[in-house]
């Protein structure tokens, strides 16, 4: 008798991806974040769908509709806070997932890595547009400031910004189109995730040692399914603790004030997960320069496969590179902190130094240290 799981055209694909998939026997908890990101995406799409049933994308009613969701819809407050804090969890998992890739040299899988960077950019775009939808003060001014950055593009900048706005300022047209894009993007992300997995399964997973693990593979189910379930339980516990005890911990109080084009908040800042990039943007006094630095701070990830000069794939046996990696992590924490501070001394200088250090470590120090370690191997 043939097994349906292995012969059915559709179930066969699922089987090869999540059941009979040969996986390295030594992958650590750092490999859990892929499945956690899948869970986050599912949570966001589901909660987002239910929110969209009650939300209205009109400047006059958007803020009121969010209030209505929280006050009058059954468990609307829960759905809204799951969606808002689910985004934070999404980014925590994303940053850890990317960090894992950098540490263990997973970026040598070119296609998987590049699709991953595109995914990161798509999730960031989705989160930005979602933040605009409640139409609070920070939503409005965040949208104004960030979309205005495109005006730094020579020649077409101003036209481009007005085209995105659908008018001469952030208004009804902007809100409506942002809602449309915010709705469609998660489905595009889901499609990209499938491509990401397709490319990953062409090569198989990397592992902490960075060595080829073809000689020692185990089936994904039950070993890694049970491990993923543990990760999922921990993630849900963390998320629900955040939602039920301090749902506004990561939000901005300014967003509880309805959008007012006539009054600018004292400190315009994005959600915490964009602060590192925002700090890099602000650390350059020139508008176009700042925008380029902002874009490059994310796209620089695509250069990692080219900057990999070490003879070893993983950093597991490279103490000098490990040291530089953790300095880079500390630098990103510093940038995140600076992004939330006002533009004044000493924060400006700290931000500029942290931005310079960020690019220097990635473009110069890590490759140099890799070469030094190659030399040390010969001793």
From Swiss-Prot:
Record membrane topology: Multi-pass membrane protein
Binding site for heme b b566: 97, 196
Keywords, comma-separated and alphabetical: Electron transport, Heme, Iron, Membrane, Metal-binding, Mitochondrion, Mitochondrion inner membrane, Respiratory chain, Transmembrane, Transmembrane helix, Transport, Ubiquinone
Binding annotation for a ubiquinone: 201
Transmembrane regions: 33-53, 77-98, 113-133, 178-198, 226-246, 288-308, 320-340, 347-367
GO cellular component, one term: mitochondrial inner membrane
Function: Component of the ubiquinol-cytochrome c reductase complex (complex III or cytochrome b-c1 complex) that is part of the mitochondrial respiratory chain. The b-c1 complex mediates electron transfer from ubiquinol to cytochrome c. Contributes to the generation of a proton gradient across the mitochondrial membrane that is then used for ATP synthesis.
Note: Heme 1 (or BL or b562) is low-potential and absorbs at about 562 nm, and heme 2 (or BH or b566) is high-potential and absorbs at about 566 nm.
Similarity section: Belongs to the cytochrome b family.
Name under which the protein is recorded: Cytochrome b
Lineage of the species this protein comes from: Eukaryota, Metazoa, Chordata, Craniata, Vertebrata
């Amino acid at each position: 008798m043939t097994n349906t799981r292995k012969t059915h055209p559709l179930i066969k694909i699922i089987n090869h991806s999540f059941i009979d998939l040969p996986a390295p026997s030594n992958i650590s908890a750092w490999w859990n974040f892929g499945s956690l990101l899948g869970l986050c995406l599912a949570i966001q799409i589901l909660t987002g769908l239910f929110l969209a049933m009650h939300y209205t994308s009109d400047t006059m009613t958007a803020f009121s509709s969010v209030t209505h969701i929280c006050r009058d819809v059954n468990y609307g407050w829960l759905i809204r806070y799951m969606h808002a804090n689910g985004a934070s969890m999404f980014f925590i998992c994303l940053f850890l997932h990317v960090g894992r890739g950098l540490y263990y040299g997973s970026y040598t899988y070119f296609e998987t890595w590049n699709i991953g960077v595109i995914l990161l950019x798509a999730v960031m775009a989705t989160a930005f547009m979602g933040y605009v939808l409640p139409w609070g003060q920070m939503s409005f001014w965040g949208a104004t400031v960030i979309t205005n950055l495109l005006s730094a593009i020579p020649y077409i900048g101003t036209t481009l910004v007005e085209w995105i706005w659908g008018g001469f300022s952030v208004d009804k047209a902007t809100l409506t189109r942002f809602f449309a894009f915010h709705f469609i993007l998660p489905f595009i992300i889901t499609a990209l995730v499938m491509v990401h997995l397709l490319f990953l399964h062409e090569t198989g997973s990397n592992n902490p040692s960075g060595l080829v693990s073809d000689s020692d593979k185990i089936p994904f189910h039950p070993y890694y399914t049970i491990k993923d379930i543990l990760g999922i339980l921990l993630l849900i516990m963390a998320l629900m603790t955040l939602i039920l005890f301090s749902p506004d911990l990561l939000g901005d109080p300014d967003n509880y004030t309805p959008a007012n084009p006539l009054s600018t908040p004292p400190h315009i800042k994005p959600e915490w997960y964009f602060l590192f990039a925002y700090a890099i943007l602000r650390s350059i006094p020139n508008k176009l320069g700042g925008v380029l630095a902002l874009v490059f701070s994310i796209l620089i990830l695509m250069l990692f496969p080219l900057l990999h000069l070490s003879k070893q794939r993983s950093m597991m046996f490279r103490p000098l590179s490990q040291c530089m990696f953790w300095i880079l992590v500390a630098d990103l924490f510093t940038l995140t902190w600076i992004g939330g501070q006002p533009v004044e001394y000493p924060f400006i200088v700290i931000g500029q130094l942290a931005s310079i250090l960020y690019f220097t470590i990635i473009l110069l120090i890590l490759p140099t240290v890799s070469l030094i370690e190659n030399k040390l191997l010969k001793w």
